Amino acid sequence: MRFIITVLLIFFIHTVQAAPVLKATISRESQVIGNDGVTHTSVFQEHMYRDQNNVWFERVLPKHHQHSTNAKNKPSHKHLDLSETAQHYFLDNKKSTRLNLVLPEDKTVIHLQTVDIEMLGLTNCWTCVFSIFDSRSVKKMKITQQGNGYTWYESQNAKNKIKVKWDNKNNLALIIDILSLNGQSYSLTKTHIQQVNITPPWTQYGKFISKEYADFGD
């Protein structure tokens, strides 16, 4: 029954899409200087695919990346590694945000509930994933520069100074530059749009094994 529901759900997702699919590469860099004087730096990339009702993120991993294995040298995701999963956000027929984690290597899809999303530190904010930065927040920011198809926004709160370069046509953030006022941390996100009108990856897991996040517990 769960398999049938999954197939029907994926079919619904595919049939409602109308807009072209957007593909982009997102580069994320962050740095934090701890109170102990140690600097922690994180740099990674993701591929993003998007249409009006679906957003898909997948981490760019090294070519020789080894998936988790058990004693018999077979893939094992008993303890889920989020870096190995693709994140498929989509709007259901009630326009509520849903999230599936997809393990292409294992041909498995994990259906997350709201409590699972919160526990994993993920988001269920549709505008945040669709536009990479919450478009509702952008509207409250000060415009500092306008160019050919883009707008620079800026704001400051008690902790951070935030600059956003916004793609007006595609409704997403091209650059997100966040610098703490005390100079101890920053994060920089850059989005490079590569192409449109491609085959979306979420059309390819309708026959995958369906699981719940609880299936990965101890």
Regions found by a protein language model. Give the residues of each.
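Short, hydrophobic/aromatic-rich segments at coil-to-beta transitions
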Residues: 18-27, 52-58, 76, 97-98, ...
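Non-transmembrane domains of secretory- and envelope-associated proteins
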Residues: 19-21, 144-150, 157-162, 169-218
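Positively charged n-region of N-terminal signal peptides that target proteins for export
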Residues: 1-4
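An acidic-aromatic
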Residues: 41, 46-126
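Short, exposed beta-strand/loop patches in secreted or surface proteins that constitute
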Residues: 45-50, 89-92, 139-146, 164-166
